[in-house]
Amino acid sequence: MRYPKQIGRLSLPGRKVQLATVAMLMAATMAACGQDGGTEASAPKAPADIPELTKDPLTLSFIWFDWPPAKALEDFANAEYTKERSNVTIKVNTVPNANWHDAMFTQFAARKTDFDIPILDSQHIGEAVTNGNILDITDFVKKNIDVDAYNPYLLAAYGQFPQAETGQRDENASLYGLPLLGDTWTMIYRKDLIGDKPPQTWDEMIAVAEKCQTDNPGVSGLAFHQANGSDAAAVTYNTVNGVYGGKLWDSKTRKIEGVINDAAGQEAMDVLVNKMKPLTAAGSGNWFIDEVNAAVAQGKACIAFNWIAASGGLLDPKESTLGTTREEILEKLGFATLPKQKTDLVPLGGMGMHVSAYSPAAQQAEALNFMKWFEQADIQKKWAAAGGVPSRTDALESPEFLNAQPFNQVYADSVSRMRDMWNVPEYARLIDIENTNVNAALNGAKNPKDALNDIAKEQQGVLDSAGGKGGGGL
């Protein structure tokens, strides 16, 4: 959190820089403060050219949730960005994952933030844009970013609103963010228990996990996210929904009821609750990222699913019982892309970085400069070597990334298979409905079919009452 500091007399050059910066960003700040004559808020525009940067000491603050990439980003930025901007300190403030959305949007609602760069899930963008919380950086991107260096879907997923259909980018749509960290699920499997070759289909994966559990008492067949918090249980169901041929909604008609709970959706819920859940450990009904990693590290799971960006600790001998060295652990652990079934879809993870509409002008200018710096090819490769997951194609295909971790090839191979959720302002309410009901079904508190029908009905009610448009994903 940034606290007020006593400010002494500014030097003349410092005052000139501040005045120039304020002048170029004044329109954006006024729009963000609601000076729009009472009309519906929209994102204020950032300038195409980066305003003159201050030479005074400055802290550039991010907000993210507490996980290893947050610490990696802070360390990386303070080591590398300060080579270009020695007066700048980078601070990545973290909150628990379950509080991440509210920690940002509570401050947005107050139109005053103690962060300059909010790191948003792709699904948060619509809410932030329609409320005027983040800057429209379309003109800035055109002037400063090589958009052809990115897979169009990733550029759209982490910055575009309204979102296009999965796999497409609308060249005429506005951009409100740039990729910070790519991510998807990886299948983590015990090579010493099930063999070197991972299961190729979802049905085969379940059969292999069941046999492994039977053959190895004390080891669960599966470990995956089930918690009623963040997007844990919802992403698990949505992933199974996708591979069994289901859809979450019809984005053109904003129809959910009759789509998510169609025959494919019901089959996916049946597979999740009646075939996968019995292969998990007792008491795992509220597991999320850390609990799944702990089960793998302790040798308690045959097959697990987790986000790639959260998997680095699995190779740390200090945290694992599978070996005393990284090499010994890798003799037992394998990482693979998700199995296919009726489709080959995998969940889009990762986040983009954005500029708070309520930050001081000097911080907004610095944020734009940081984004331009961060998206350079050589910096993206350094970020990959430091443990990040880049989105630039040249960085994804670089030895710096592919050789950094054994699961990085999984991400590179998964990009073309990704799908997202609903990119609409009502996302937070939709995800809460789905988490609650999927978690209830997984824990035996609700019949699976009833849970899915309730999801469809309640989510449809949210969209119907909102009456808005926009969004995308499948």
Per-region residue spans from a language model:
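Short helix-initiation/N-cap motifs at beta->coil->alpha
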Residues: 94-103, 203-204, 283-297
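Glycine-centered hinge/linker elements that transmit conformational signals in sensory
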Residues: 208-209, 253-286
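Long, aromatic- and glycine/proline-rich binding clefts that accommodate carbohydrate-like moieties
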Residues: 155, 330-337, 384-436, 440, ...
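Extracytoplasmic/periplasmic solute-binding protein
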Residues: 165-181, 185, 204-257, 292-294, ...
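Short, solvent-exposed loop/beta-turn-alpha elements that line the ligand-binding surface or hinge
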Residues: 52-53, 138-153, 198, 226-228, ...
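Hinge/lid segment of periplasmic solute-binding proteins
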Residues: 49-52, 123-184, 233, 330-336
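Conserved N-terminal structural module of periplasmic/extracytoplasmic solute-binding proteins
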Residues: 2-14, 18-25, 33-133, 147-149, ...
